[in-house]
Regions:
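Phosphate- and divalent-cation-binding pockets in alpha/beta enzyme and binding domains
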Residues: 48, 72-73, 96-97
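Short, glycine/acidic-enriched loop or turn micro-motifs at the edges of active sites
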Residues: 12, 70, 93
């Protein structure tokens, strides 16, 4: 059974991540049988969520947020043994990582 985790920073981009969460879930439902969604509440949450997902055998971890959320999620995947595929939807203010990688800055287009 294929499983993915979506980590959402609900305050990223002035709350924009919440608006795009259902779009991402719908898109990923065509690729994964099980989708789990977790919302961050503070520093370190994304790291903990991503690490736990990798340790539990999830196939992929996606995050919606800014550069801080991306950084925490990648660190969690690293701590979990790099066993998960990673993806992200830029919903932050600056989004340096997505700009460097050429990912569309419009969340709908990135999805």
């Amino acid at each position: 059974m294929s499983r993915c985790l979506i980590i959402i920073n609900p305050v990223s981009g002035g709350g924009a991540a919440r608006r795009y969460a259902l779009d991402l879930q719908w898109k990923l439902s065509t690729l994964f049988e099980t989708i789990e969604v977790k919302f961050t509440r503070g520093e370190g949450d994304a790291t903990r969520f991503a690490k736990n997902a990798c340790e539990r055998g999830f196939d992929a971890v996606f995050c919606m947020g800014g550069d801080g959320t991306v950084n925490e999620t990648v660190n969690g995947i690293a701590q979990g043994g790099f066993s998960c595929t990673f993806g992200f939807i830029p919903v932050g203010t600056v989004n340096d990582m997505s700009r460097a990688l050429g990912i569309h800055q419009n969340p709908t287009q990135a999805i």
